[in-house]
Amino acid sequence: MKAPFTSLAGFRAVFETLPQVDAEAVEAATARNETLTKPKGALGRLEDLAIWYAGWIGDGRPALERPQVAIFAGNHGIAARGVSAFPPEVTVQMVANYRAGGAAVNQLCHVAGASMTVTELELDRPTLDFTVSPAMTEDELVAALAAGWEAVDDESDLLVVGEMGIGNTTAAAAIAAALFGGTAAEWTGRGSGVAGSALEAKTRVVAEGLERHGDALSDPLEVLRCLGGREIAAMAGAIARARVGRTPVILDGFICTSAAAVLHALTPSALDHAIAGHVSAEGAHPAALARIGKEPLLDLGMRLGEGTGAIVAINILRSAVACLSGMATFAEAGVSGG
């Protein structure tokens, strides 16, 4: 679907009339769940997940058949500041690896039965160093938001967004600090594996960016423009498109959560259609999830990004949906006690 906005004002307008969850589907799923051949509440959180999914799909007996994983790749000017354990050219190399089927995300998509798309966002033109100037112009931000919006498959019934971009945990840390408050050190973690003096340098870069753009950081979209990256903006655009289309979303790690947090800062109901797939080993991720009110499904010590933790959670949600829709009721099974 072509993005319905050509400016930041147009993107903001998207959030003025967001569709609501289908209350009738929630009611139907809840009623069905209470008649299934199990003690009440015996499936724990799976029951809540299935009812949540039913409400956004709009079907009291839903199916999960067409999950989409949308990966966005972008390069960052701050990568030249040595904030990552890997050089900037790795972004392009990893995109080639995705297309060849050789990355972890490819294997996990296969296991989860998910389609996978990869969107490259001007990899030959990194964003600007946000310690010197805004990372993006308004036009560049709008283009990235639109690219994310248009990458969403309208036929999908679940969306996961992932990212590739050397330096993007630095941008994510800066976004989180700007949106949530606190110091650069509180939000800056090891990312690709930096430690010691390299981690100190990364933290300084985040602090410099916050100081440089302090006057603009009361506006969430200005936070994204000044401190973010094209792939982070594209993730925000994709999550927004899913919200408008009432497509459920599983959020991934710290970078994805920072992108989602921009939407949450615009209006908290922007993330009603989203759950957190996991909590990553990136130290600030638990705090970021708490700030947007999301409880993770998994804690596996993952810190790869690229959507991987959320993809692992797809089959948990699929299991929940299968139980709601496929189990027999007490009456159907001829089992007493229902």
Swiss-Prot record:
Record has Protein biosynthesis as a keyword: no
Disulfide-bonded cysteines: none
A Gene Ontology biological process term: cobalamin biosynthetic process
Gene Ontology MF: a single term: nicotinate-nucleotide-dimethylbenzimidazole phosphoribosyltransferase activity
Active-site residue numbers: 306
Record-listed E.C. numbers: 2.4.2.21
Spans traversing the lipid bilayer: none
InterPro entries: Nict_dMeBzImd_PRibTrfase, Nict_dMeBzImd_PRibTrfase_bact, Nict_dMeBzImd_PRibTrfase_N, Nict_dMeBzImd_PRibTrfase_sf
Keywords: Cobalamin biosynthesis, Glycosyltransferase, Transferase
SUPFAM superfamilies assigned to the protein according to its UniProt record, in alphabetical order: Nicotinate mononucleotide:5,6-dimethylbenzimidazole phosphoribosyltransferase (CobT)
Pathway: Nucleoside biosynthesis; alpha-ribazole biosynthesis; alpha-ribazole from 5,6-dimethylbenzimidazole: step 1/2
Signal sequence segment: none
Reactions listed under catalytic activity: 5,6-dimethylbenzimidazole + nicotinate beta-D-ribonucleotide = alpha-ribazole 5'-phosphate + nicotinate + H(+)
Keyword presence, Cell division: no
NCBIfam families found in the cross-reference section: cobT_DBIPRT (TIGR03160), PRK00105.1 (NF000996)
Protein family: Belongs to the CobT family.
Function of the molecule: Catalyzes the synthesis of alpha-ribazole-5'-phosphate from nicotinate mononucleotide (NAMN) and 5,6-dimethylbenzimidazole (DMB).
HAMAP family given in the database record: CobT
Protein name per UniProt: Nicotinate-nucleotide--dimethylbenzimidazole phosphoribosyltransferase
Species annotation: Cereibacter sphaeroides (strain KD131 / KCTC 12085) (Rhodobacter sphaeroides)
